[in-house]
Amino acid sequence: MGSRASTLLRDEELEEIKKETGFSHSQITRLYSRFTSLDKGENGTLSREDFQRIPELAINPLGDRIINAFFPEGEDQVNFRGFMRTLAHFRPIEDNEKSKDVNGPEPLNSRSNKLHFAFRLYDLDKDEKISRDELLQVLRMMVGVNISDEQLGSIADRTIQEADQDGDSAISFTEFVKVLEKVDVEQKMSIRFLH
């Protein structure tokens, strides 16, 4: 299986993905093997249904929101490069990356990009704000029926009240960042990928 994965991924493609995502050659090869095993249609792309077969996503209350993050607007398939680009947001920041070239593009796994990714999970209508209704939807996904609607409403109201600095009864990206400034987002939004 590993040899099949490496033969289908051209060296030049591997180098481009490595440069773009920061993953090592062996990580890319391993993830390519995983990608091809998920690709039930064997057409070089994954569908939402392919992702829903992943047990960790199937049981995650935000699984559908995470799956949607892999698909550009209006698309229903994702190729390997798009798959890797999204996974790169979850790659831990290595010590040697903290002093990267300031003129180069910001790494996909930077604090800022991780925060943008998390914000988009909440901003369901993509209007650059998290409304009370959007916050309620996400909270409902996370807690299910274990908490009453009244309690959830109270949590949403209190969250917005604490985060909302401009009085528009919503949370902007800037306000979202401010709320999370003391949270170790780099650690909490990281998945360990084997080398």
From Swiss-Prot:
Record: residues binding Ca(2+) 1: D123, D125, D127, K129, E134
Chain positions covered by the region annotation Necessary for nuclear export signal: 143-185
Residues reported to bind Ca(2+) 2: D164, D166, D168, E175
Family: Belongs to the calcineurin regulatory subunit family. CHP subfamily.
Superkingdom of this protein's organism: Eukaryota
Role of this protein: Calcium-binding protein involved in different processes such as regulation of vesicular trafficking, plasma membrane Na(+)/H(+) exchanger and gene transcription. Involved in the constitutive exocytic membrane traffic. Mediates the association between microtubules and membrane-bound organelles of the endoplasmic reticulum and Golgi apparatus and is also required for the targeting and fusion of transcytotic vesicles (TCV) with the plasma membrane. Functions as an integral cofactor in cell pH regulation by controlling plasma membrane-type Na(+)/H(+) exchange activity.
This protein's GO CC annotations: cytoplasm; endoplasmic reticulum; endoplasmic reticulum-Golgi intermediate compartment; extracellular exosome; focal adhesion; Golgi membrane; membrane raft; microtubule cytoskeleton
Protein name in the entry: Calcineurin B homologous protein 1
Motif Nuclear export signal 1 location, chain numbering: 138-147
Tissue specificity note: Ubiquitously expressed. Has been found in fetal eye, lung, liver, muscle, heart, kidney, thymus and spleen.
Keyword terms: Calcium, Cell membrane, Cytoplasm, Cytoskeleton, Disease variant, Endoplasmic reticulum, Lipoprotein, Membrane, Metal-binding, Myristate, Neurodegeneration, Nucleus, Phosphoprotein, Protein kinase inhibitor, Protein transport, Repeat, Transport
Biological process according to GO: cellular response to acidic pH; cytoplasmic microtubule organization; membrane docking; membrane fusion; membrane organization; microtubule bundle formation; negative regulation of calcineurin-NFAT signaling cascade; negative regulation of NF-kappaB transcription factor activity
PTM characteristics: Phosphorylated; decreased phosphorylation is associated with an increase in SLC9A1/NHE1 Na(+)/H(+) exchange activity. Phosphorylation occurs in serum-dependent manner. The phosphorylation state may regulate the binding to SLC9A1/NHE1. Both N-myristoylation and calcium-mediated conformational changes are essential for its function in exocytic traffic. N-myristoylation is required for its association with microtubules and interaction with GAPDH, but not for the constitutive association to membranes.
Consequence when changing V183A: Inhibits translocation to the cytoplasm
Domain named EF-hand: residues: 26-61, 66-101, 110-145, 151-186
